[in-house]
Amino acid sequence: MKTRIAILITAAVCAVSCYPDYVGDYSRTACGFANQTDVRSLIVGEGMTFSTGVALGGTINNDEDRMITVGVDYSLVNNNTYKLFTGHTFAYIANLMKDVPSISALPASIYELESDSGLPGTAIIRKGTHLGVIKIKVDSAAFLSDAGRLLPKQVIPLAITNGNGTDVIEGKEWSVIGVRYENMLFGSWYHGGYADVADSGGNTVRTESYATTIPQADNLVWTLTTTGPFELTANAVGGEFNGSAAQMKLTLGPDDSITISSVPGAKYDVQPDGDSKFLRSRLLQDRKIVLNYKYVSGTETVHAHDTLTFRNRIRDGVNEWQDENPKHYE
């Protein structure tokens, strides 16, 4: 959110001024949305909310509270807007839209617009600040009932309906946000562990170790990819190098357990071999996953015991490698 706030403020200032000459207030102070099309990812298990904002430009010192009325404008959900998504400047948005043939409005019954102003649909740009925040709270059960929402096929179309005394920047008065989800364990993980290798008779013939090292070579780092609200795939097994294809599926249970299963097209038929679980730390960087599974390689059976340690994840174009929520450090 910190990164997005900086972008919002910079964009608003540039929209009403030329930055190299910006040494004082301009005659016109105006507000608007920085991005007319955007995609936001809701993280399953971390609270199904996100924030967007109305930014103020044209003044260094905002000397008053400004109430900006924001509403939903369904007329913005059209083919022209869809084309802006598919041809987006940000590659991660354009890539997400490749498999989305059209957009539709997210049903209003699934989400609420909240604000620290206490007034529904009102963003308040407080005195001394340049950003008014709108928080979108999504009903998790209703949203996740459609697993296809992994893609941003549905949008929330926002528009400033009244600046209440503050000018609105032409062309910046609206923002259409595609909404999708990611599982909380998606991303890149340092990998380590050991494997007991048994012969056809079930006798252990050797133990292979592959310790976790930080930093770790990229071809040893595992990638977990969201395939459903509570499902991910992993792109490696045991001590082998990773690849582009999924090698096993992880299904998360309500008790933080993980069920391991095979996936079509994988190198091995991976099966569970003992309990697997994830450690739900409040801090992103402290999360770990413990996996126990087996697979047959030639005439041998590999019994793998792995630990994954969180490295980073890319959410909405932002590299997240440690928790940014101050409350999680309390």
PLM regions with names:
Residues 129-130:
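Beta-strand-enriched, solvent-exposed domains that form extended recognition/catalytic surfaces
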